[in-house]
Amino acid sequence: MEIRHRGVAAVAVLATVLGAAGCGTDSGATGSRSTGSAGEEGRPKGSAASLTWEFEHIADFDGELADVAVLAKDDIWAVGTENNGDSHARLLHYDGTQWKREPLPEALGDTVYPPLLEEVGDKALWLRPQNSGDGAAANRWAQWDGTRWSAMPSPPPGKVGDFEAAGPDDVWALDGEQTAQHWDGTRWTATRLPYGASDLAVVGPDDVWAVGSRSTGPGTEMEGQGKEYDQPASMHWDGTSWKAVDTPQARFKEPIPPEASAGLGQVFALDNGEVRAYGTNSFNHGEVEDEPADEFIRLRWDGSKWVEQQGAPGGCATRTPVGQDDKGLFLDGNWYLTDDGRCVKIKRHRLPVSTGARKASNQSLWLKEIHRVPGTDEWLGAGHVQVNQSGDPFSAPVVVRLKRGG
């Protein structure tokens, strides 16, 4: 999804597969794509050539972590799910000395799904339910004041999707597909979006972007298929209202495959204010022979219009950004793109055998979220390691820390 200007990145999914031995950089089951010989584009020289996710914490239950919030080196929160026949939400906290399980705040009520952690300012944290379809639970939020959890007195109405905070008095949230809610520190205000949106990026108080798709207007006409050809859509908030922004169309050549549609699923604001958007032009696969390949959409706002963004090399070609540090971009799938355009695969370790993972097991690391530790260039990630082995597969919730060099 998009970077937040406090150095917080929201990650849809980061996946990488560990082989049966070593920490290698194999990409066999990752879905990542590579070009050229032996990956010279993915193995640059210099300090960026060696990045590794190392285990910071391995939880003592079968399950996964779904979110993490890093308020300080000694104040880290993680939420996840324990799989013990029935799924149970779990809350973990690190106080600088050890990780401990904490009870979920009573303000949330009963919940099976792990809640989501939202950093809204300096050491300010909100805990909200997932959009699970339960209207009553959707409005039960909790807030952390540095000492205790309490009920949030004014949660946003509706069922919140994407959530972006530039500060405790400047918060945006998607409510359904075509409504945006804004918190000014006192109250929530709803505004109507021109089109359906799936993602938000906050550049500044009067500079907010939303992206999604539209089913009306130029490029949506499609003869003989009984439906519209959805097109990429983008919208901009200028401090007064949301306005539709002209967005390049995407369309397969004739014959158009079944149920073709195009849209933007991610908008990302760099630290320098540059805005990028990503999406796909796809269709319902398996209905015709000689199918075309899905098309990857990558756009950059040049200050007045959207222009096509140059593709990255090697395994970074179809990856989207999930975070930014001082030297480049973290991409989904555990890839890293340096500022000078080099593509690096982030390495990873295998679980120790003490966890029950056998030496011959197949292990895959899935990260749901990465965060910069405030005031540092250290990064933490949260997710799980899936261990596939005969008779005793399991999932280990993990927090990982990025190691540079060595």
Please report, for each region that a protein language model flagged, where it lies by residue:
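Secretory targeting and sorting signals
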Residues: M1-G36
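Residue-level hotspots at or immediately adjacent to binding/recognition sites across diverse folds
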Residues: G24-G406
